[in-house]
Amino acid sequence: MQKLLSLIIVALVLYNIAKLKISSDDNNATIIEQASVNNSANNENQVSINNDPPVSLNGNLFERTISKIVINALKTEEGKAFFENILQPLNKPIDTKDYTIPVHKDLITSLFKINTIGTGNVGPASCGHVVTVFYQISDMSNNLISEDTKTFTIGSGAVMLGLDNVIVGMNVGQAREAIIPAKYAASVGANNDNADSAYRVNVMLKSILPQNFINSNEVKIYDNEIAYRIPLLCGEKIAFNAKITRLANGEVLYDSKAKGQKVDMKIGDITYPLIFSYALQGKVPVGTRTVIAKGQTFKALGSNINKIISQESLPLNEYLMLEINDFK
């Protein structure tokens, strides 16, 4: 444990040093570039020095190697999300009254740089809902690529996987703006010259079906382990063990481990309990996630088929406990 903590602290220090160095070098590059432009009026062929300058690193070979890894990681969206989310828990005060970890709050918001506008009046949308949205997709220079009003199932990737995950958690009437990394915009990138570019997205939610919602204040979620990796997203496939227990008397209603067969599902599959997709989207696949919610959230979305538990036998108004782990 001590070695792990030391490694995390070293990573944090390197992260902050790298940010300071990159910021300093960018500022220096700007000053040098301006001076160069002023002194080269008679030389149109002078090479611009606005390229990324090499970062001067100090320390021994190991320290320089780690620093280079950190700096290269910071150039990617996934790397930025990784390091930013290491810092978040350390910068927050400990609240002994509430140890729950919001499912869709930190990692997803950071990954897609989501900004929500308005409050809306119906929702929130979960992975698996059928939604109608108006969206605009632009490149990073704000050149419009496409816009449309479309109806689709969240998790289907009908437009692009990143858009589906931005919509999760929205209410009807709300708008969001986000930046989608190229990895989660493959269908859009395939039609553009620069397939590795990120995209700006603006989306407004117009309707949700069916109107069967999970409100975060009615669900308690606990993780026994935290790891800073890219989280699971709506529309991805994952295998895991799941156990459902009736809190009133401890009766086990479902246990995949006892059955000897893991649950293998696409997040957003409406033939599985809605609470499964809700708990999985935004979860880093390590440890055990424990969810406490009413039985009605264990119903499958808009379907009489429930691959986990018979909907007729569900105690809708009782609290159940879901445990998911052994991710693969």
UniProtKB/Swiss-Prot annotation:
Domain PPIase FKBP-type: 128-225
GO MF term set: peptidyl-prolyl cis-trans isomerase activity
Enzyme class: isomerase
Keyword Isomerase: yes
Organism: Rickettsia bellii (strain RML369-C)
Entry keywords, A to Z: Isomerase, Rotamase
UniProt-listed Enzyme Commission number(s): 5.2.1.8
Cysteine pairs bridged by disulfides in the record: none
Pfam families recorded: FKBP_C
GO biological process assignments: protein folding
Gene3D superfamilies in UniProt: 3.10.50.40
SUPFAM superfamilies: FKBP-like
InterPro entries in the record: PPIase_dom_sf, PPIase_FKBP_dom
Name recorded for this polypeptide: Putative peptidyl-prolyl cis-trans isomerase RBE_0327
Keyword DNA damage: no
Catalysed reaction equations from the record: [protein]-peptidylproline (omega=180) = [protein]-peptidylproline (omega=0)
